A protein has these predicted regions:
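Short beta-strand elements
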Residues: 18-24, 280, 384-387
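Basic, amphipathic alpha-helical bundle interface domains used for macromolecular binding and assembly
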Residues: 34-45, 60, 67-77, 286-287, ...
């Protein structure tokens, strides 16, 4: 007796079809599972056996072989419980053989209840691509799987519901599908709460408008973390494609919040400085996404940047340039998207008061230099904007007048991003920070005065080729915020102003030593 059931798996970020073949033959009772299952998959035999008996269904008193094809790809997780369950019953002709256009996913409880799984969205999209039209999933995963528009998704709370549906006794109702709409009003921290710090606020606005990286340097308590946490409130809304891509990553990692089928707000990730390189970039024996991939299309905030390990910080360099990261491990190889905005915050020295207007720094020049040099030149070079966050004067702190709100700043950011979307339509680029050298040359047109100013800055500041390109991208964003198609001297001057911290701190301490 033989049955085959369609299921799915996930490798990296992408789903793939899996055929669950069940063969019941003569011989002593035994259950064997082949096809590179991991320990969680192997354990499904006991869950399936208990579920079948507790639902008063027959368990074969003979040899049962289950094959998960393709057999050369390792299968992980408990999501194959339901298809194995269906396969055993279908092989005994207790229920009809499922059709090739039907697929099944779900973990079983011992009483036959269905429990949610990770990776429902990438697997649903893979099922749709493979020609599957009906997908049976645990009820908690139904809204997420229903994002795949060409699938009919059937939510089930128990394997008994699936049996009755296949037997034609009681049909399951398809999951409702709601159209994609905007995230709505921002309910998180607002820029109106911030007192003073006009330069830092402007830097965050420019960073949001162009998708640029930003480094904030200042003494403790001046609002660096407060400012960073308000950055998502001024970022443009995600498109449907961006929302799906972001949700796929969180779903595959098992981090999608319960009851949230699609992430609509841009992600803000803030890992602790004790995080390992594998935790930051991704890893494990079987590759899993790390913080830089979980921050895709959003913000990665690294507070107390010099406290991170050197390998962790240096691992950011390639993803910041390429927007993807490839992880190779014994359990496989996976490529994850990692197009994120990096926001770093740090003190200027170990005690935090180097250069403070009123408090004396207790660090020696050697300590200051060693502390600052934890940030390597190549990583500092990738910070498009560098801004100082000084102490706020009392008059500004006590000012009761409301500051500019996030909604007002966001309107300007949205207008600048709309200009960029129209300009780069059909190129695959969505913001200025992702401009390729060819597009940079084509779209970053300088006035003669701006060109002379940039040439002087290039020589005087000793900019690298990468720094030059990044400065030009920032100037392009500032011009977009001003509604100017050409980049003028004022736009270049402001972009240069946001590249001065390395001269103030890193180069000065090096000379003093």
């Amino acid at each position: 007796m033989y049955a085959h059931v369609v299921s799915l798996g996930v490798t990296g970020l992408d789903g793939y079809p899996v055929t669950v073949e069940t063969h019941i033959s003569g011989g002593l009772p035994k259950f064997a599972m082949v096809g590179l299952p991991d320990s969680a998959v192997k354990e499904s035999s006991e869950r399936v056996r208990s579920a079948i008996k507790n639902l008063n269904c027959p368990w074969p008193a003979s040899h049962v072989t289950v094959n998960l094809a393709p057999a050369d790809v390792r299968k992980t997780g408990s999501l194959y419980d339901l298809p194995v369950f269906i396969g055993i019953l279908a092989a005994q002709q207790y229920i009809p053989q499922p059709e090739p256009h039907q697929a099944f996913l779900g973990e079983l409880g011992l009483d036959g209840t269905l429990r949610p799984i990770a990776g429902a969205l990438p697997m649903a999209l893979a099922a749709q691509k493979a020609g599957v039209t009906e997908l049976f999933v645990p009820a908690e995963n139904a809204a997420e799987a229903a994002v795949a528009e060409q699938l009919t998704v059937y939510p089930a709370r128990s394997a008994a519901d699936v049996i009755r549906h296949l037997a034609g006794q009681a049909k399951l109702s398809p999951a409702s599908r709601t159209g994609y709409d905007a995230a709505g009003q921002w309910l998180g921290p607002d820029f109106a709460d911030v007192r003073g710090q006009a330069e830092a606020r402007r830097a965050l606005e420019v960073a949001a408008a162009g998708g640029h990286n930003l480094l904030m340097v200042g003494p403790p308590g001046t609002g660096k973390s407060m400012l960073a946490k308000r950055l998502p409130s001024i970022l443009p809304e995600m498109s449907f494609e961006e929302a799906v891509e972001t949700t796929k990553i969180h779903s595959a990692a098992g981090f999608l919040p319960s009851g949230v089928p699609l992430l609509k707000n841009r992600v803000f990730r803030s890992p602790h400085h004790s995080i390992s390189m594998a935790g930051l970039t991704g890893g494990g024996s079987t590759p899993r996404p790390g913080e830089i991939s979980l921050a895709h299309n959003g913000v990665l905030f690294m507070d107390e940047l010099p406290q991170f390990t050197r390998p962790a910080m240096e691992s950011l360099r390639q993803p910041l340039e390429d927007g993807v990261i490839t992880i190779s491990r014994a359990g496989g190889r996976a490529t994850y998207p990692s197009s994120f905005m990096l926001i770093g915050a740090m003190n200027p020295c170990p005690c935090g008061y180097f250069g403070h207007p009123t408090r004396a720094c207790t660090c020696s020049q050697t300590k200051v230099s060693l502390y600052l040099n934890k940030i390597s030149g190549p990583l500092l070079d990738r910070m498009d904007l560098q801004v100082e966050v000084p102490p706020v004067e009392y008059d500004r702190m006590a000012d009761a007048r409301p500051a500019e709100s996030s909604a007002e700043v966001r309107r300007r950011v949205e207008a600048a991003r709309q200009i960029q979307r129209r300009r780069y339509a059909g190129t695959g680029v969505t913001c200025n920070a992702r401009l390729t050298p060819a597009l940079l040359k084509k779209y970053c047109v300088l006035t003669p005065e701006a060109d002379r100013l940039l040439a002087a800055a290039y020589e005087r500041m000793g900019l690298s080729g990468r720094s030059y390109d990044r400065l030009l991208r920032v100037a392009r964003t500032i011009a977009d915020l001003a509604g100017s198609e050409q980049i003028g001297p004022d736009h270049v001057a402001e972009a240069i102003q946001f590249r001065n911290l390395d001269r103030k701190y890193w180069q000065v301490t090096a000379k003093e030593l």
